[in-house]
Amino acid sequence: MITSFYAFLDYLKNMKASSLHTLRNYCMDLSSLKCFLEKKSDLSPTPPLSLHDNTYDYPPLSFSLFTKDNIRLYLLEQIQTHHSKRTVRRRLSAIKSFARFCVKNQLIPENPAEMIRGPRLPQELPSPLTYEQVLALMAAPELDKVTGFRDRCLLELFYSSGLRISEITALNRADIDFQSHLLHIRGKGKKERIVPMTKVAVQWLQDYLNHPDRASVEQDHQACFLNRFGKRLSTRSIDRKFQQYLLKTGLSGSITPHTIRHTIATHWLERGMDLKTIQLLLGHTSLETTTIYTHVSMKLKKQIHDETHPHNLEE
């Protein structure tokens, strides 16, 4: 099984173009399964799988251990050792993907995890920002440095087009159509889509890309957003700067760049955009994913109703 684990990780990297974050999660989740199956077969523990070095001489691990019963026992152990439901569901998803790969490559006759269901998650409604909070956040970057222009531009694009943080960092200069105010986005699973930008976002993007201090450090000539060394900006850097701006504006530290994606989706819905259009703009595979914003919008309307209705104010 070990060589199959590595073949699967190689497939994700080279054929599916999975992000480093995704690869790390798969590597960690399959390592966890490997550890469990080693215990089941009374093998001594071996090092976890590695994305960088697959030269370790692992003892044989038979596919005969890769059964529905053992997968169920593994998931039960994960729950009993206080792993979150979200983690358990992710690990089951990794196992199912690996099993599908094995079936496709005729390593096993059928997928033993296909009919296994993970623990049900409570529906957590995203809490969007108000428009005033969005404006306060956008005003946080200081514009005396090129990094301030960059960060203001990032925030404008998040709110303008509802982009994921990974889509922002992957954005290239060639993906921008300034004349039509459109962006060519490569989303999850290599899915591509075209999304519009607001005039305000276009102006900030032009100001940032034409900033003389940007050109003086530029080393990556394709990337749209650069760090202070002139290389492509990372998601970790965006997260770190985002937290600094939250602190500066006094907003909750639980807010993330993805919150702005939830926010613009909710604002679109409240202003009359239909769900199908929102689905296409956000790059959701399923309309069911987009439907959550109808619940958010109704929750906000109920809150405003409760806070402003005359009968409630009289209490």
From Swiss-Prot:
**GO cellular-component terms in the record?**
cytoplasm
Q: Could you name the active-site residues?
A: 164, 188, 258, 261, 284, 293 (o-(3'-phospho-dna)-tyrosine intermediate)
What InterPro entries does the entry give? CB, DNA_brk_join_enz, Integrase-like_cat_sf, Integrase_catalytic, Integrase_recombinase_N, Integrase_SAM-like_N, Recomb_XerC, Tyrosine_recombinase_XerC/XerD
Family, similarity comment: Belongs to the 'phage' integrase family. XerC subfamily.
Role summary: Site-specific tyrosine recombinase, which acts by catalyzing the cutting and rejoining of the recombining DNA molecules. The XerC-XerD complex is essential to convert dimers of the bacterial chromosome into monomers to permit their segregation at cell division. It also contributes to the segregational stability of plasmids.
Q: How does it assemble?
A: Forms a cyclic heterotetrameric complex composed of two molecules of XerC and two molecules of XerD.
Q: What is this protein called?
A: Tyrosine recombinase XerC
Tell me the organism. Answer: Chlamydia trachomatis serovar D (strain ATCC VR-885 / DSM 19411 / UW-3/Cx)
